[in-house]
Amino acid sequence: SMENNLLAIMYQAAKEIIAVSYKYNVPTNQFSFSYNKELQEEVETIIANLRELIEDYTETLAVATHTDEKEHIISFINRESHGKTLVDRINAYTTQFKKELEVAIASGVLLNVAEGELLSSIKESRKSPLFNRHIRQATSQGFPVISRLKVPETYGVGRTNSSFTALDNLTNFAIAEGWMDYFAMIAQKSGAIGFMSFRGSSYPCQQCDDETTYFHVFSNGDPVPPYHAHCCCYIVPVSY
């Protein structure tokens, strides 16, 4: 699954960043990636590699066995939506991940935590990274690591403050979009003029309910599910 792949590559990157951070002799109470130019460059290289891996995994799983329409699907999931592309969002969330790692490593350095133990705590707190046990311990001992490194504690109402959750939602949504776009394309090639949308779950959702109330016409550009993250709706094509 994308979640398992994402977990593996994000925490391989975290392991590498912890190792290079511990390699440089940065004063414990002043730790930041930018304190040392070589450290900063090594971290940026690891994050750039992570971004490429996330893009590759997402595109591969979105295309899956539908290689006959590979270029169309990749172009579709990489289109601009609400002013940003898939790559823009991956870049933003991996930058957020880098900041989460920076504050966790700063805490680990202060507390003299072993590399393996620090990595374990980062994995454990991936869904609420600023509640990492070492960050909390450093803060309770009077080291304001979160504010010193200027890490936002919230990204706004309804938005996760976890880069892992954000990337998991984003990539799974893109993969689902790729599959549904292919399904709609094949339906049109087979003579379908539109579709009805049906709920795939009983979870209360006004948007999904609304989409079931009318006949969607392909030529109108009517939206195909998923309509939002975790959407379980599906379509039934309709021909003349």
Regions found by a protein language model. Name each.
Residues 1-157, 239-240:
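N-terminal leader/targeting and assembly helices and adjacent pre-domain segments
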Residues 146-240:
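Acidic, glycine-rich two-metal-ion catalytic cores of nucleic acid-processing enzymes
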